[in-house]
Swiss-Prot record:
Name of the featured protein: Receptor-like protein 14
Family: Belongs to the RLP family.
Acidic residues composition bias: residue spans: 911-922
Biased composition (Basic and acidic residues): 898-910
Compartment(s) where it occurs, according to its Swiss-Prot or TrEMBL record: Cell membrane
Matches recorded under Pfam families: LRR_1, LRR_14, LRRNT_2
Organism: Arabidopsis thaliana (Mouse-ear cress)
Primary gene name: RLP14
InterPro entries: Leu-rich_rpt, Leu-rich_rpt_typical-subtyp, LRR_dom_sf, LRR_N_plant-typ, LRR_R13L4/SHOC2-like, RLP_Defense_Trigger
Cytoplasmic-side positions: 950-976
Regions that span the bilayer: 929-949
Signal peptide limits: 1-26
Length: 976
């Protein structure tokens, strides 16, 4: 009997052991059903296009172990769910979360509902338990609600989760005062993250959260330093984040210096000013101190020498000036990251020192420190991962010893200095990022650069003076994704190894050099290449077959070379990824292929300055944002396709041979610049142009347009719309080269190197006539340029006074037309006008004296009209010379030499611009009436005199009749 009992006990223990070893086949059935109900609820809130991605491993299969489903973790003993994550769901709209769906998970310890961009929970509800719902989850310790659309309505629900120790609510953009008192029952809370939530006002009391060890209030709108006193009660606080708020004034030492347990203090991105508090040196437990991006000045306090635990110190982007000693860092044995820079050019960091560093840094970032020489302490570093010495006036040789002493160095940034000699180590190195752009380096690239630096991911050597050919060893850089050698003096043909070996290249920029020979003459292996910029070189011949192998090419710029051949044979027909194509100022010829403008993603096309001819294609891609088209300075003929007007954002067709009228088109609101200067367009200006409410630059000059100027042109927008700019833009399809490396991580702070280059950014340059010259506008000046040019046409009639409503207009040119009547006094509303040209017309009347109020007017030309009266004086009119008024003999006064003595001064002191305009028009009308009466009376008197002579018999009458008979006789003889 005892043996049977013993055997039975052994069997039970064996079964328990097997269960422990193998685990449960599935979670508890009750929780399985609850999970499926939760999934069903999530599906009901998800957009149709995201249904397949909703928890796909959560299946209604009894053989499936739900403890292995995504986002779950089970207790190995009980089989109950202890961790649940249901983020990454594509909701069709913001939705409430039904908390009752979570009640079956009785042992749940961690709940992650973070959106991470995708989720859009905006509230919580429970129709049965109400605000007490979360009290049912008695074991819940960690709750993550970050990156959603929650508001303050969730706080009463959270107050019931009394077991919480960690709560993340960041990135919900809640706004308003922080209702921390509504969390008074969370007495066990140790970590609270409220960052990036839009809170403002004062920082409230935290007296009921005495166990709090980590608090993050970063990226809110707190501004008062007084309320920081409320944080003093948190005596157990070890981590405090107040970065990116609006805190200003001196750093409150009575607050931070009393937090003796602080290990991490993040105050970056505020407006703190003054010197660093000496008492910060008493925080001997401090490991992380970030004071970057403030307005601090002074020097490092000597007390910092006592921060024995300090590992991370960032003082970058402040206002430090004068001599800056690094002596207080000498004994910081644990220091790993040191960052320092200044917005002031007066900072002079100590480079020569007698102390030997006791630390081994992984990050040494000292840009904008006016070093002059590399600091001595870097010589003793052997564990560096990142070194940034950019913008420091350093000269001489590139410091290759940094690579030799630090075999694990990943990032070396030396840009914007005065280095003259480029050297590399003799042994292979693991360097991944090398930036030596904007220096004074000459000579050639070392032949072995590809052998020594085979792991490079990013190399920028642009804006130097390199010469010679590119070394063939560069083809061994198999991992390189970004290579920029633009703005140098390289020459010769591109090495074949570069085109076949660097198969990881995403961006290749070789512009502004002297490279020659054909472009891409061979098949390449650059299948990952997205951006290829080769403009401003000496490339010749046709574009080679290698272009067809660039299957992912999106941006191709070969402008300003000597390329020949046909466009149709140069660009592959299957260039479906192409978004930017620039081949301007070459020798390309032939017609424009319709397939080119039909490429779906094409957003920027510049073929200007070539020998292209024929009709423009009518098939244009219907882009949501509009296509930017530059085809000026070619020989295109035929009509202007309506599809170009309907789908272009910028359309530049200047100096071609287009004919016909400007077609009627459907306004899509895309057009912002329309340049049709120098063609053979005829007909009237269509009123459809008035519907271009976003237009900024309109040039119809030097054509054969006739008719009147539509008054509705005052509907043209002269206000920069939201999101509309001309100086530069990135396409809606954006490709960039990114690189991210993490060098240090703490509770709320991550020190990482992030490199992102937006390869689609373009600086737009547009030519427009202003101030009597033809200028190119780009950059910031283009963003403020508004212009209307209708000059050199056959327009007639009056100048519409409504054009004065274009208050932001900077250039208006109506010269060389057939315009009559007077100059509208309403032009005085053109407050920003800089250039006003009305010359070579048939304008009459006076120059409105209200125009003297145009304080920005720099060029004013009304020459060769029929204007009369006294030239106004005052303001900018005192700066114009006689050339502005030539060909108007009835104008008098300064700056002409014609006296106005005896003429009535037409400047009257009246009350409004409209009344003045009526007065000017009346004066012009009176002049014409006098002219008509004078002419009529002259003819009447002459006729009466002839009749009188014919009524009396006198020698004069007989003589007159003889003359008439003679004319009649001669007429008969001529026609007989």
């Amino acid at each position: 009997m005892e043996r049977k009992v013993f055997s039975g006990q052994n069997l039970i223990w064996v079964m328990l052991l097997l269960v422990q070893l193998r685990g449960y086949k599935c979670c508890i059935e009750k929780e399985r059903k609850a999970l499926l109900e939760l999934k069903k609820y999530m599906i009901s809130k998800t957009a149709d296009w995201g249904l397949d991605s909703v928890l796909p491993t959560w299946t209604n299969d009894t053989k499936s172990n739900c403890c292995r489903w995504e986002g779950l973790k089970c207790n190995q003993t009980s089989g109950r769910i202890i961790e649940l994550s249901i983020g990454q769901t594509n909701f069709k709209e913001s939705s409430l979360l039904n908390l009752s769906l979570l009640h079956p998970f009785e042992e749940l310890r961690s709940l992650n509902l973070s959106g991470e961009i995708y989720n859009e929970f905006n509230g919580l509800f429970d129709d049965v338990e109400g605000y007490e719902s979360l009290r049912r989850l008695r074991n819940l310790e960690i709750l993550d609600l970050s990156s959603n659309s929650f508001n303050n309505s969730i706080f009463p629900f959270l107050n019931a989760a009394t077991s919480l120790t960690t709560l993340f609510i960041q990135s919900n953009y809640i706004g308003g005062p922080l209702p921390i008192k509504e969390l008074k029952n969370l007495t066990k809370l140790e970590l609270l993250d409220l960052s990036r939530s839009g809170y403002n006002g004062s920082i409230p009391e935290f007296t009921h959260l005495e166990k709090l060890k980590a608090l993050d209030l970063s990226a809110n709108d707190f501004s008062s330093l007084v309320e920081l006193q409320e944080l003093k009660v948190l005596t157990n606080l070890e981590v405090l984040g107040l970065a990116w708020n609006h805190l200003d004034g001196p750093i409150p030492k009575e607050v931070f210096c009393e937090m003796k347990n602080l290990r991490q203090l993040d105050l970056r991105g505020n407006y703190f000013e003054g010197q660093l508090p000496v008492c910060l040196g008493n925080l001997n437990k401090l490991r992380v101190l970030d004071l970057s991006s403030n307005q601090l000045s002074g020097n490092l306090p000597a007390s910092f020498n006592s921060l024995e635990s300090l590992e991370y110190l960032s003082l970058s982007d402040n206002n430090f000036e004068g001599f800056f000693s690094l002596n207080p860092l000498a004994n910081l044995t644990k220091l790993k990251v040191f960052r320092l820079s200044s917005t002031s050019e007066m900072l002079q960091v100590e480079t020569e020192s007698n102390w030997l560093p006791k630390f081994q840094l992984t990050v040494a970032a000292l840009p904008f420190c006016s070093l002059g020489k590399i600091p001595n302490f870097l010589v003793y570093q052997t564990n560096l991962r990142l070194v940034d010495l950019s913008s420091n006036r350093l000269s001489g040789d590139i410091p290759t010893w940094l690579l030799e002493n630090n075999p694990e160095l990943k990032v070396l940034q030396l840009k914007n200095n005065s280095f003259t000699i480029f050297q590399i180590p003799t042994i292979v190195h693991k360097l991944q990022v090398l930036d030596f752009s904007a220096n004074d380096i000459t000579g050639v690239l070392p032949d072995n650069i590809g052998h020594v630096l085979p792991r490079l991911l990013h190399m920028n050597g642009s804006h130097n003076g390199f010469q010679g050919n590119l070394p063939s060893s560069m083809g061994e850089m198999n991992d390189i994704s970004f290579l920029d050698l633009s703005y140098n003096n390289f020459s010769g043909e591109l090495p074949r190894s570069l085109l076949t070996g660097c198969f990881s290249l995403i961006t290749l920029q070789l512009s502004h050099n002297s490279f020659s020979g054909p472009i891409l003459p061979i098949q390449t292996r650059l299948t990952s290449l997205i951006v290829l910029r080769m403009h401003n070189n000496l490339f010749t011949g046709e574009i080679g077959v290698g272009l067809r192998t660039l299957v992912n090419l999106s941006i191709f710029d070969a402008s300003n070379n000597r390329l020949t051949g046909l466009i149709s044979s140069s660009i592959p027909p299957d260039s479906s990824h192409l978004i930017m194509l620039l081949l301007s100022n070459n020798l390309l010829e032939g017609t424009l292929p319709p397939s080119l403008l039909a490429i779906h993603h094409l957003n920027f096309l510049d073929l200007s300055g070539n020998l292209l001819s024929g009709d423009l294609p009518s098939s244009v891609v219907n882009s949501m944002y509009g296509i930017k088209i530059f085809l000026h300075n070619n020989s295109f003929t035929g009509p202007l396709p309506v599809t170009l007007l309907e789908n272009a954002y910028i359309l530049d067709l200047r100096n071609n041979k287009l004919s016909g009228s400007i077609p009627q088109f459907v306004n899509t609101g895309k057009m912002i610049t329309l340049l049709l200067r120098g063609n053979n367009l005829t007909g009237s200006i269509p009123r459809k142009l008035c519907d271009l409410t976003s237009i900024r630059l309109l040039d119809l000059s030097d054509n054969k347009l006739n008719g009147v100027i539509p008054p509705c042109l005052n509907h043209l927008s002269t206000e920069l719309g939201e999101g509309i700019g001309l100086s530069g833009f990135s396409q809606e399809i954006s490709f960039g080269d990114s690189l991210q490396m993490e060098f240090y991580r703490s509770t709320f702070l991550v020190d990482e190197f992030m490199l992102y280059y937006d390869s689609t950014y373009m600086i737009v340059e547009i030519e427009f006539a202003a101030k009597q010259r033809y200028d190119s506008f780009s950059g910031g000046t283009l963003d403020y340029m508004y212009g209307l040019d209708l000059s050199s046409n056959e327009l007639s009639g009056v100048i519409p006074a409504e054009l004065g409503d274009l208050s932001k207009l900077r250039a208006l040119n109506l010269s060389r037309n057939l315009l009559s009547s007077s100059i509208p006094a309403n032009f005085s509303k053109l407050k920003d006008i800089e250039s006003l040209d009305l010359s070579y017309n048939m304008l009459q009347g006076n120059i409105p004296h209200q125009l003297t109020n145009l304080t920005s007017l720099a060029v004013f030309n009304v020459s060769f009209n029929n204007l009369s009266g006294i030239i106004p004086q005052g303001g900018q009119f005192n700066t114009f010379n006689d050339n502005s008024y030539l060909g108007n003999p009835l104008l008098c006064g300064t700056p002409t030499d014609r006296s106005c003595e005896g003429k009535k001064n037409t400047k009257e002191a009246d009350n409004g611009g409209e009344e003045e305009e009526e007065d000017d028009d009346d004066e012009a009308a009176i002049d014409m009436v006098v002219l008509y009466w004078t002419t009529g009376s002259t003819y009447a008197i002459a006729l009466i005199g002839i009749l009188v002579l014919m009524c009396f018999d006198c020698p004069w009458r007989r003589t007159w009749l003889c003359i008439v008979d003679a004319f009649i006789a001669s007429g008969k003889s001529m026609f007989s």
